[in-house]
């Protein structure tokens, strides 16, 4: 005897849950301010990033000046890890996001700025593109190597971390690289020795833009004694 029954297919009651990534949130930028972009990557050194970031961010507390929007730019949406282990989520990804016009580009030093980072064509291309419209491009410590590799310092005097000056002169023998100064300002380029002296280079740019009184107020807010005349530096006067 053959029995014919109703054979219904078992329904798959399991539910697959798709991972939904949260929508990326970008900084709210005040259009009346300078846009200051900090180029960061794995191995960035804390001080060269946070020193100028602190100075520039504090401009929003000064009255009657064109203050600064500060934000970070990297080649990833994931966090980057600084040399000292601090994890930072970049505000913008220059490989995929629409980057706002950057008025001041800051290139802090990173662990591989003397080797593998100099072969990063996408990063160098971003720097060159940003340089075209930027009012200032600044570097701290070995960030100068990146600017040099991008060709930005070909016609400019510069400096870098004191113990790396000879290395930079060897790698870029046609450049005029100064020693025994904490920063050099030549045209739109400001290069600094880095380390804790990154504060001085950032304060100098603020004094250049806003005047001595504002620079001293910014310095005082971070308990820094500021007197440009006491800082070893070079300013190249353009004819």
Give short role names for the model-derived ranges.
Residues 137-138, 158:
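A short beta-strand/loop micro-motif in the catalytic core of glycosyltransferases
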Residues 4-137, 145-148, 166, 179, ...:
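Extended, subdomain-level signal for the structured scaffold at the beginning of enzyme domains
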Residues 194-198:
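Short acidic alpha-helix initiation/capping motifs at coil-to-helix transition points
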Residues 33-35, 157, 188:
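Residues that mark the start of a beta-strand
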Residues 178-193, 223-227:
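Conserved Rossmann-fold dehydrogenase catalytic segment
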Residues 154-180:
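A conserved active-site-flanking secondary-structure segment within enzyme catalytic domains
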């Amino acid at each position: 005897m053959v029995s014919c029954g109703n054979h219904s297919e078992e329904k798959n009651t399991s539910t697959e849950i798709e991972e939904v990534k949260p929508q990326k949130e970008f900084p709210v930028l005040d259009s009346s301010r300078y846009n200051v972009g900090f180029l960061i990557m794995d191995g960035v050194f804390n001080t060269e990033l946070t020193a100028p970031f602190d100075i520039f961010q504090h401009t929003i507390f000064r009255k009657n000046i064109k203050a600064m929007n500060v934000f970070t730019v990297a080649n990833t949406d994931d966090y980057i890890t600084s040399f000292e282990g601090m994890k930072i989520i970049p505000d913008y990804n220059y490989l995929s996001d629409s980057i706002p016009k950057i008025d001041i580009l800051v290139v802090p030093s990173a662990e591989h700025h003397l080797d593998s980072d100099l072969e990063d064509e996408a990063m160098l291309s971003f720097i060159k593109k940003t340089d075209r419209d930027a009012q200032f491009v600044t570097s701290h410590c070995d960030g100068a190597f990146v600017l040099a590799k991008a060709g930005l310092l070909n016609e400019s005097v510069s400096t870098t971390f004191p113990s790396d000056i000879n290395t930079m002169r060897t790698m870029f023998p046609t450049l005029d690289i100064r020693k025994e100064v904490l920063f050099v300002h030549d045209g739109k380029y400001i290069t600094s020795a880095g380390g804790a002296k990154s504060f001085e280079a950032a304060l100098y740019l603020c004094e250049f833009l806003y005047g001595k009184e504002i620079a001293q107020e910014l310095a005082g807010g971070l308990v820094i004694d500021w007197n440009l005349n006491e800082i070893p530096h070079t300013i190249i006067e353009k004819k």
